[in-house]
């Protein structure tokens, strides 16, 4: 049987890192999106995709 994951079982410093990163990832993603519009390189597009995935994962509590 699969063990359920509880965010409360994590140490307090890990929970704090998750909360801070969830607040910081959105402005960084917006900045990267604007930068990608003006200077669309392959690296910028890949970085934007990774940041969007991280933002969604943190928002939906997958991480």
From Swiss-Prot:
Keyword field? Cell membrane, Membrane, Transmembrane, Transmembrane helix
Could you tell me where this protein is found in the cell?
Cell membrane
Give membrane topology per the record.
Single-pass membrane protein
According to its UniProt record, where is this protein mainly located? membrane
Instruction: Identify one Gene Ontology CC term for this UniProt entry.
Output: plasma membrane
Q: Where are the transmembrane segments?
A: 37-57
Q: What is this protein called?
A: Uncharacterized membrane protein YszA
